[in-house]
Amino acid sequence: MQLNEAVSKRLTELLDERNMTQYQLYMKSGVPKSTIGNLVNCTYDSMKLRVLHELCQGLEISLPEFFASPLFEEENLEP
């Protein structure tokens, strides 16, 4: 899978685990709703690390916790 697909799946997992909507994440993180929607729907080419950091703050996790998923293991990602 491509990296943007892994980010989308992980973000969706974390939202589901917390019973949190994209709107609630927007309210907690300050990341625009459209950006969150683009990430969830894989309709972006790149993202800034700052955005991911803000999302993690809204989810109350660290960046390492975000990436602590089999989704990001080398064998699961396309080069």
Which ranges hold each PLM region?
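Short alpha-helical DNA-recognition segment
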Residues: N19-N38
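The alpha-helix within a helix-turn-helix
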Residues: L15, Y26, C56
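Short, charged recognition helix plus adjacent turn
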Residues: N38, F67-P79
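Short, basic-rich loop-to-helix N-cap that marks the start of a DNA-contacting helix
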Residues: T43-E54
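Residue-level detection of the helix-turn-helix DNA-binding "recognition helix"
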Residues: D16, G30, N41, L71
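A short, Lys/Arg-rich alpha-helix, primarily the initiator
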Residues: M1-T21
